[in-house]
Structures are given as C-alpha cells and as structure tokens.
Amino acid sequence: MQKYTSEARQLLALAIPVILAQVAQTAMGFVDTVMAGGYSATDMAAVAIGTSIWLPAILFGHGLLLALTPVIAQLNGSGRRERIAHQVRQGFWLAGFVSVLVMIVLWNAGYIIRSMHNIDPALADKAVGYLRALLWGAPGYLFFQVARNQCEGLAKTKPGMVMGFLGLLVNIPVNYIFIYGHFGMPELGGIGCGVATAAVYWVMFIAMLSYIKHARSMRDIRNETGFGKPDSVVMKRLIQLGLPIALALFFEVTLFAVVALLVSPLGIVDVAGHQIALNFSSLMFVLPMSLAAAVTIRVGYRLGQGSTLDAQTAARTGLGVGICMAVVTAIFTVTLRKHIALLYNDNPEVVALAAQLMLLAAVYQISDSIQVIGSGILRGYKDTRSIFFITFTAYWVLGLPSGYILALTDLVVDRMGPAGFWMGFIIGLTSAAVLMMLRMRYLQRQPSAIILQRAAR
C-alpha cells in the first residue's frame, strides 16, 4: 500500500502544475472572447469562428509532438540523458515542418468560412483576418510545446505552469493595445486578438527556451553548437509515435464540432443548454487530462529504469486517483447542476435543459477519466497506434451514430434531442474506457523483455 501512496504523491506533484497551466490556457481564451466582445458582438463572433478552425489544426500539431514526452522520460529513466538533446532538436525540426502546413491551412481557411450558410460578409472578413493574424503564432506555439515536452519528460511540469501564467499576463495588455489601437498601434478589433495571441506564443517560447538554457537540472542536456540537420530516422520514429495521438485528438475535437452542428437546427434553447453542459464538462476534463500527462511521464520513466512492475504501479495508481477525482466531480456536478447552469444563463428553459444534460455529464465523467488516463498509460508504453484505433472506433463508429439515432430519429425511442447525443457520448466514452483497459492489460501481461524492448525503441 505504501508504494501506491508514494506513487500517488509523485503523480499529483506532476499533475497539479499541468492543471494550473491548462487553467491559464483556458483563461487566455476567455480573455480573448470577453475583450473582443467588449469591442463588438461581430468581433466576438469572428474570434469564436476563427478559434473553431484554429483548434483542430493546431491540436493536430500539438498531438504529433506529444510523442516527445514518453521518449524523453524513457531516456531519462534509463540514464541515457546524453541522447535527449538530439531528440529535442528533431522535435524542433518536426514542429517547424508542421507549422508550415498549419499556416497554409489557416491562410486558406477563408474558403471554409465564406462557404458557411448565410454568414455575414463582414463577419467572414473579420474571422479570416483573425486567423491570418493568429497563424504567425503557430510556430511559436509548437516550438513552445517542444520545449515544454522536454521539461515534462524530465518530470519538470512547473515551468509549463509558470509560462502559462506569463502568457496570460502578457495577453491582457497586448490585447488591449491591438484591439483598441493604443501606443501608436492600429485599432484592429477582433483581429487584434489574433495579433496578441500570436505574440504571446512567441513570448512563452522564448521564456521557456531561456529557462531550459539556464536551468541547473538541465546542464547536462544542451543542444550542440549550431542546430544540426534533420535526422530522418529519429523524425520518422517521432511521427510514428505522434501521428496516432494527433489523429486521435483531431477526431475527438471534430466529434464535438460535428455534434454542435447537428444540434444547431434544434433551436436556441437546445443549443444553449448543450453548450453550457459541454463547456462545464470541458472544465472538469482538465483534471483527468492533466493526470494522464503525469501518468505518461511516470510510466515512461519506470520503463526506462527497466522496471515493468513499477510501471504497472504507476498505471494503477493513476487510474485509482483518476476514478476518485471523477467520483468527486460527478457528485459536485449532480449536486450543484442548477446553480452551475445559472452562472451561464438565467433563462428557465435553458437552465432546465442544461441541468438535465449535466446529469448525463456526471455519468460519463468516470468513463472519460478512465479513457483519458488509459490513453496516457498507453503513451507511456509507446503503444500509440492502439490509441487512434480505439478512439476512432469508440467515438465515430459507436458514439456518434448511436447519439444521432437517439437524438434525431425514432428508431429506438422517441427523439431525445440533445440528450440523445449525450447518451452517445456516454456510449462512446465508456467503449473507449473498456477498450483502453483491455489493451493495457494485454500489454502488461507480455514478458518484461518485450515490454522493455518496445519502450526502448
């Protein structure tokens, strides 16, 4: 029992800074929305539309680079720290290549925006302008993620938290300058949010790079003189590990976007109730997601040390802590669901629907916690391909079709409206949780030599 208690302490010590970093990131989005809304409703809508395109594109790159964390954790655990700098350098090359692709997609996103049904031309122009300003921050964001993944792979999660709050502090005044046109800068409205956010990502990257160069704990991990050329072998391995994670993230984000589109014709009350429940659930999701990042680090580190039993302990402890957290957040959601809904809106119909959907959200929080921590465990074992297949099957083959049938057809029961899609979420997330656990058990039952050989690749 003592080893599980000790492991839980180490996991929470890693996870809490990640949680706070995510809070800072969420707050940046909130600040952008509020400050753009203070300028005009059109500018706020433009930022919302632009963000809905930015997120899937940038999260694809973010997911691709997540492969660095278990790689670095495993090298750190095995005492091969001299190889870490080369892996990080190739991560920067990969981030550079992906940045170019993301920037091309975002530059041409106007075709997608202007093809939206009945969109106001002025709104479309502002959304395109916002994206074309923001896209210059894509390299800064992805380079920052490489540096952050280096720190987290070395079990240093606090720098990411500090840089997150630094970004938030810089974002507010820079937003003010570019939205309203102060200190000789042009008055850009919502487009100014894009300029500010792009600048903030570069500030965060430069600050993180400065930390890495001066941190005593990383003195033995220094990039070689010059930047070196791309190493096709290392980059291919990073892509093999990261691409399934990137695709899984992309399919998860697009699933919720598709559901939002399917709910939109049902009416204002249904859309508002669905959005409130989804927004609150996203806030609760920060807890298991951060714990999953910590579990990846611990499992990778233990496998690097050559101890498959300690890796199992880290995995089981992470699941136990995650389930306990989910039970607490589920009880909190059920107990205070009406009060939470009132924080968003005071329309009685909207509040009633949001409170009903939050009951379903409370049910799926446990499944959601298990599946996301399970994904973190599999990343630690470098078994990322299975994450993609499980996510795609659970969300798009089981969850979305069942949600569509329950919400919009009479095939099984009378049309349930938004609640049907939330039942689909429960089916999809529970399926993902079961499949993740089955895959984890299969991996852990393999001979230690095979597990360690996979981890060392």
From Swiss-Prot:
Membrane-related topology note: Multi-pass membrane protein
Gene Ontology biological process terms in this record: sodium ion transport; xenobiotic transmembrane transport
Subcellular location: Cell inner membrane
Keywords for the protein's UniProt record, in alphabetical order: Antiport, Cell inner membrane, Cell membrane, Ion transport, Membrane, Sodium, Sodium transport, Transmembrane, Transmembrane helix, Transport
Highest taxon, organism lineage: Bacteria
Regions that span the bilayer: 11-31, 53-73, 93-113, 127-147, 160-180, 188-208, 243-263, 276-296, 314-334, 350-370, 387-407, 418-438
Main location: membrane
Pfam families xref list: MatE
GO CC aspect terms: plasma membrane
InterPro entries cross-referenced by the UniProt entry: MATE_fam, MATE_MdtK, MdtK-like, Multidrug-R_MdtK
GO MF annotations, alphabetized: antiporter activity; xenobiotic transmembrane transporter activity
HAMAP family, per the entry: MdtK
Function: Multidrug efflux pump that functions probably as a Na(+)/drug antiporter.
Family statement: Belongs to the multi antimicrobial extrusion (MATE) (TC 2.A.66.1) family. MdtK subfamily.
Protein name from the UniProt record: Multidrug resistance protein MdtK
Species whose genome carries this gene: Salmonella paratyphi B (strain ATCC BAA-1250 / SPB7)
